Amino acid sequence: MSGYTPEEKLRLQQLRELRRRWLKDQELSPREPVLPPQRVSPVERFWNKFLQDGALWKNVIYKTYRHSIFAFTHVLIPVWIIHYYLKYHVTTKPYTIVEKKPRIFPGDTILETGEVIPPMKEFPDQHH
């Protein structure tokens, strides 16, 4: 026995018809695609109105604005964050912030200068 049975032939014919119909459905009509209206932010709306007449000086201002925003967000802010982290969180003594100064009492000697802290003055007329 060779060849397809009548049921198999019918099934293949139906599959071919389905494929043809599916391919035909994939073709777009002249009205398609229907795109939703594009949302424009207030800042973008301002720049669109500002640049409408095409004056050269307005274009220069816009390019300066765009480059400064890029520099601020991609250079300056990361540098500030790195500086803050290095200054306040990476502590390799003795070249960082002094977290707690040592207490000094009357009669103590300051090591760097050799100065002796004098005793506190007495104020007999004031009460604590």
UniProtKB/Swiss-Prot annotation:
Record field: transmembrane: 64-86
N-acetylserine: residues bearing it: S2
A biological process from GO: mitochondrial ATP synthesis coupled electron transport
Keyword Cytoplasm tagged: no
Modified residues (N6-acetyllysine): K24
Keyword Transport: yes
Main location: mitochondrion
Membrane topology note: Single-pass membrane protein
InterPro entries given in the database record: NADH_DH_b-subcmplx_su6 (IPR019174)
A single Gene Ontology CC term: mitochondrial inner membrane
Similarity comment: Belongs to the complex I NDUFB6 subunit family.
Assembly information from the UniProt record: Complex I is composed of 45 different subunits.
The protein's name: NADH dehydrogenase [ubiquinone] 1 beta subcomplex subunit 6
Organism of derivation: Bos taurus (Bovine)
